[in-house]
Design a protein with these regions (language model features):
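Acidic, low-complexity, intrinsically disordered interaction modules
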Residues: 12-59
Length: 59
């Protein structure tokens, strides 16, 4: 899995998913279109990778 900084610099921000458990979540699409990464922003302002989803069947 790529790190948060790489995702935020190289991936396309798809949408703001709002707040989940007090943390803001943003979806990013990988450059090759195979993955969606979910980045959460903690209340202290730091970011972390919450999860990823692979899109099967895309080339």
């Amino acid at each position: 899995m790529p790190d948060v900084e790489w995702i935020m610099e190289n991936c396309h921000m798809m949408r703001d998913n709002g707040c989940w458990g007090g943390e803001k979540q943003i979806s990013y699409a990988s450059p090759d279109g195979q993955y969606t990464y979910y980045i959460n922003k903690r209340k202290d302002g730091t970011y972390y990778l919450h999860g990823a989803c692979k899109h099967y069947g895309r080339t």
